């Protein structure tokens, strides 16, 4: 089952629990707008290269649409559509005044020079500039993009619309980025984990973690969890996977990964098969890389008691059912990894106000939002006698449905 089919399935299950009528259900499911553009750029050697870019704007009932732009060879319409829909429910779960969107370009950024990436980003922005905006659709970084990409988008957009720092989030600090944004998704994973463990009378200290992915989300989550006394026993990234039952020294691993562009060769742990990271003996598993990695092939072998979804859609529906029967508690992506979009909201607010918050305020507000979000999620679980995933979906969908109905759109 691909990401879009799985997301639609979860939507329909939640819709049934909420008792939505068919007209409203259809209104919520169909994207507001789907954009597909061709982007041709001159390469450094003088040849021309063409790429296809996408932007799916899913829903704006609760506010401007919000979502990342990813650069990856496998970017395709169904995946972008699914991720845009998930952003709609995620922003609603977080209770921030946004809808959902997602975008991407089918390219391998590792095969393009910095100047080629800049040209590609600027051409893509030229094609979509009149369809995004501060109060319309606010992009952010995602896989294969980062603050520099956002700086190029801001600069190109500003040529058409004047200086508009709030048109993108995840920017460099010198262009209006927010303090604390870089760590926000990983910090949100920490706060989400603390909220779940507290519900079960536990703390992070002494818990054994396996983390799949050591990019922005996984590395920050690992550092912050380690700082709280959590023991990181296994980590993987695109270069390999490592394990140390006594706990990995995360600060040393961060230094190694920065110097060697990955964790491969780290001498403070043993190398293991990257595919085994998800089934390592641990208390808490944090998938923080690609989607669809937990499936029926490996779900029965998972030993973790808790799964915190740092990635988008890491667990497919078949695995969900298997893990539920095993008693594994899954904290779903649309809550667990919402720290990034929440601090993006803080950045947007700061840009509109023209006033910068200090990092302590950013982190304090993020904890407030994540703690409240878990409380709201649990209340929906109790109301509908459902698991955490359906609790999150019913929470998000219900909030969007209410806004849609009040506007008079769903009738």
From Swiss-Prot:
What general EC class does the enzyme of this chain belong to? oxidoreductase
Instruction: Give the UniProt family note.
Output: Belongs to the Glu/Leu/Phe/Val dehydrogenases family.
Q: Where is the active site?
A: 102
* Domain of life (superkingdom): Eukaryota
One Pfam family name from the record?
ELFV_dehydrog
- What phylogenetic lineage does the species belong to? Eukaryota, Viridiplantae, Streptophyta, Embryophyta, Tracheophyta
Q: Which organism is it from?
A: Arabidopsis thaliana
One GO cellular component term of this record is:
cytosol
Catalysis performed (reactions): L-glutamate + NAD(+) + H2O = 2-oxoglutarate + NH4(+) + NADH + H(+); L-glutamate + NADP(+) + H2O = 2-oxoglutarate + NH4(+) + NADPH + H(+)
Listed EC numbers: 1.4.1.3
Q: What is this protein called?
A: Probable glutamate dehydrogenase 3
Task: Extract the SUPFAM superfamilies matched here.
Answer: Aminoacid dehydrogenase-like, N-terminal domain, NAD(P)-binding Rossmann-fold domains
A GO molecular function assigned to this protein is:
glutamate dehydrogenase (NAD+) activity
UniProt keyword list: NAD, Oxidoreductase
